[in-house]
């Protein structure tokens, strides 16, 4: 038997060291790489046999066999694919980053490229074996040839290639001599789990057998559901796949199975769960959409395949156009990935828009489960905010049901050009807020925002389809003129301020720095007073949230708006006109009440309690 000792290409030692110790963060993917290579070999031969059937004569059923020899510390992977001769072994295994598959693809043209599930884009996958093995031997016989050759290396810079006299059928056998520190990979259960996790949908059947080569058990389903036509898949099959993929107990609410053809080709099989996922808002949450390339699992981590706000999606995306980086664990940032992401996002939002219109009750349940996550996209600079807002729904204060902003606009009062909202923690409390009593009295609807994220997205989305989005806590809202045309607006606001200057000055004198300004309200109809902020100030709830998060130290002074039609305010005003200024405690109590209704802390709870007791005593006596 003749043999040759050769050195790897220049710098190969450094590259091997980098790859073994740094490039792969998950050692178990060595199995994925070797099985992928075996699958490539079978696909190559299947393609070539179309024009030369003699190549597979007597052995036309392609398969991959995995064995474990615990006594000798070996893992063996065997395929009956195209095999390699001596020159192939030197070219494909003796040179880092040279891929026989890549060269093979260059020789294909037309539709044959689509028909070959060839996944090796780089020549380093094989060398991931050295993460777990201190020696690797390869025995191979090329289809159509009679000679057998071996390749052997410890990964330290040299390899031996030799002729072999042993009897060997077509294909390749790889033997890994497992390191003592990695013997857990010799465990049958673990190895089976690895194969099923990464290679379940490889088209070539993968068998596991005992040391003697008996008792073959097929490990993979060898059938990627997403590659089959939708017309051939039943609803139960979709449900079964969803549950096995995501370990879910619920049924999917929506199934999206699409094949994208054109400049970029990919297939997606995506599911929207019917139940809320437990880790939706967990900081360590994992993405549940798996990336496959030609039916081989690549990753569900460190890939920007779907936007974060669609993280409730479950499923797979399979593409032939995605380039991989040299480790195949993380994708290069490129336009292809971005286009796939945009296409998926557009498809999902389109389906949600359809469900919102056709199945409003079911959509309400979906929104309860995932609306909070979906609205996070409104805070992202790269999101099409208008398209995303089209699928958002909010509780209507006027109708006490969930509606979209488009429905809100369709029900505008004549002359109305503003979308009003009020944010808070509890929708029932918001309904009784003095901030919206005047608007509701005029049949002007108000959207109730109850998620924390609402206070953030409205800061970057001040309008929708040309209509301003405004908080009902703003000081400049006039319910009498909010539906008037600009030409009809008059000077009532200034007249009211001047008329009640005695009243507002008195309140400001008593409250001092506790308030920024005291104004006559144009939106209150029943309550005596409320807090408000100017258009340029931070919303009250947003400020409170930032204080809780210690992002700002103290609350800013708010405006106090007074309702001159309220009996209490009217009495104070009449007393002032009679030169009676003995309502200081009542003024403070009105302010304290406004703070409480807005969820703001009372400046002095002891003084508040005393004032309340004094007024109650006077009322009794």
Curated annotation (Swiss-Prot):
UniProt-annotated stretches for the region B: 329-544
Pfam families: HATPase_c_3, HSP90
Compartments (UniProt record): Cytoplasm
CDD domains: HATPase_Hsp90-like
Keywords: ATP-binding, Chaperone, Cytoplasm, Nucleotide-binding, Stress response
Stretches the record annotates as A: 1-328
GO molecular function ontology, one term from the record: unfolded protein binding
Record's GO cellular component terms: cytoplasm
Top-level taxonomic group: Bacteria
Ranges for region C: 545-621
Coiled coil: none
Role according to the record: Molecular chaperone. Has ATPase activity.
Similarity comment text for this entry: Belongs to the heat shock protein 90 family.
Assembly description: Homodimer.
NCBIfam families assigned to the protein according to its UniProt record, in alphabetical order: PRK05218.1 (NF003555)
Protein's name in the database: Chaperone protein HtpG
Species this protein is from: Rickettsia prowazekii (strain Madrid E)
